[in-house]
Regions:
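Active-site catalytic motif of lipid deacylating hydrolases and related acyltransferases
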Residues: 1-69, 141-180
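Hydrophobic/aromatic beta-strand patches that form the interior of the parallel beta-sheet core
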Residues: 4, 37, 111, 133-138
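Serine-dependent carboxylesterase/thioesterase catalytic core
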Residues: 52-135, 143-144
Length: 182
């Protein structure tokens, strides 16, 4: 089993604070070896770069380790990266590596936190094949994923921080969901 996770905007390389909390929680719930792949991208505004890296890695895993169950996830900008990989059937806007047909059979679950794409609808609207395998979590009045009054963004910004998700038990909630899909 492998978790492929894209960190949030401006987080240091790796899976980020929330990614680490989610993976730790998942490890405590399953009796399996869990490897981790941190999506390699600058985590600034480069969604396409992250999506290409995630997609290339997933395709490589499907080809070279076809029995490995994959869990895809992301926080904030990383959730948008995951959205592109799962929902874009063709290359566009710098994303040039759509997943081939049948790849979905290797993806056990998807965990998204603070997903800005919620403004246009959940990922499952665009890629319904993942409906029963996806958990999308939005913490309270997080202005990134909860369409709220733009005048409240500054006051509500702390709701979007990784620590708020962790403190609210959402890393654990996602781990419970994913563990149930394995």
């Amino acid at each position: 089993m492998q978790v492929v996770f894209a960190r949030g905007r401006m987080e240091s390389p790796g899976v980020g604070t929330l990614g680490n909390a989610f993976i730790s929680a998942l490890r405590s719930k399953v009796n399996k070896n869990i490897s981790v792949y941190a999506v390699n991208y600058p985590a600034d505004t480069e969604v396409a770069q992250g999506a290409n890296d995630m997609s290339h890695h997933v395709q490589d895993m499907v080809t070279n380790c076809p029995d490995t169950r994959l869990v895809l996830g992301g926080y904030s900008l990383g959730a948008a990266v995951t959205d592109v990989v799962l929902a874009a059937p063709i290359g566009a806007f710098g994303f040039d590596s759509p997943l081939p047909a049948g790849t979905d059979q290797h993806i056990a679950a998807v965990a998204l936190f603070g997903n800005g794409s919620q403004w246009v609808g959940p990922i499952t609207n665009f890629s319904p094949i993942y409906n029963d395998r996806t958990i999308e979590l939005c913490h309270g009045a997080d202005p990134i994923c909860n369409p709220a009054d733009p005048n409240t963004w500054k006051a509500n910004w702390p709701q979007h921080l990784a620590g708020a998700y962790i403190d609210a038990g959402m890393a654990n909630q996602a781990a419970d969901f994913v563990a149930g899909k394995l």
